[in-house]
């Protein structure tokens, strides 16, 4: 597949070479689970790093012949968003504050996350990129903060149903591939 040179946010994305961190975009659905439509917010504004830990389930065995076998049978991905500075009017703040205020649990914490590969545009669809959507749970780890502002750090636990598709930046919409 031929990769074209693409300009995004007034910066040219190279057709080859190392990928800058900002080209891997992470979005979380800030809408309530009962909402009819997703409301994706991009993560990272106040973050110096955002790492999805894969947490592989690995079993290693040694047999009596001295051989080692390794089985990796699943992943339990999760990521930490710390700090998250609350901003009035931001849908993600409203969602997180609702979790704090109402001490929400179980299905009230369900959401979805989308990882968007900004280095991988969908040809013939301007502003559309290859993306992966996955179900997740939001875990607010604490709230409060210091003099820098009100903070609601949270963890995102990926729960499966990973689907490949396309993400349109202008409308923040995900469409699964057929």
Predicted feature locations:
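Solvent-exposed edge beta-strands and adjacent loop segments
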Residues: 10-88, 136-148
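Extracellular/virion structural assembly segments
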Residues: 13, 65-134, 164-172
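A generic alpha-helix preference that emphasizes hydrophobic side chains
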Residues: 6, 78, 153-154
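Short beta-strand and beta-hairpin "edge-sheet" elements
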Residues: 45-52, 116-164
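Protruding loop/beta-arch "assembly-hinge" segments enriched in small, turn-prone residues
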Residues: 2-12, 157-178
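Extended hydrophobic/Leu-rich segments
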Residues: 1, 8-9, 51, 109
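Structured catalytic/translocation cores of nucleotide/phosphate-coupled proteins
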Residues: 26, 105-107, 151-153
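Intrinsically disordered, low-complexity regions enriched for glutamine and histidine
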Residues: 3-5, 24, 113-115
């Amino acid at each position: 597949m031929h990769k074209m040179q693409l300009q995004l946010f007034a910066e040219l994305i190279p057709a080859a070479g190392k990928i800058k961190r900002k080209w891997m975009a992470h979005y979380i659905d800030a809408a309530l689970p009962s909402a009819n439509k997703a409301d994706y917010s991009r993560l990272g504004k106040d973050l110096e790093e955002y790492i999805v830990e894969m947490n592989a389930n690995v079993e290693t065995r040694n047999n009596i012949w001295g051989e080692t076998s390794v089985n990796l049978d699943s992943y339990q991905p999760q990521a930490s968003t710390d700090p998250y500075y609350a901003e009035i009017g931001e849908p993600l703040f409203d969602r997180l504050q609702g979790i704090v205020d109402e001490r929400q649990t179980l299905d009230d914490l369900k959401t979805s996350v989308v990882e968007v590969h900004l280095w991988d545009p969908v040809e013939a669809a301007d502003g559309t990129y290859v993306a992966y959507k996955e179900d997740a749970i939001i875990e607010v780890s604490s709230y409060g903060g210091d003099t820098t502002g009100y903070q609601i750090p949270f963890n995102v636990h990926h729960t499966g149903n990973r689907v490949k598709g396309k993400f349109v930046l202008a409308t923040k919409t995900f469409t699964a591939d057929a």
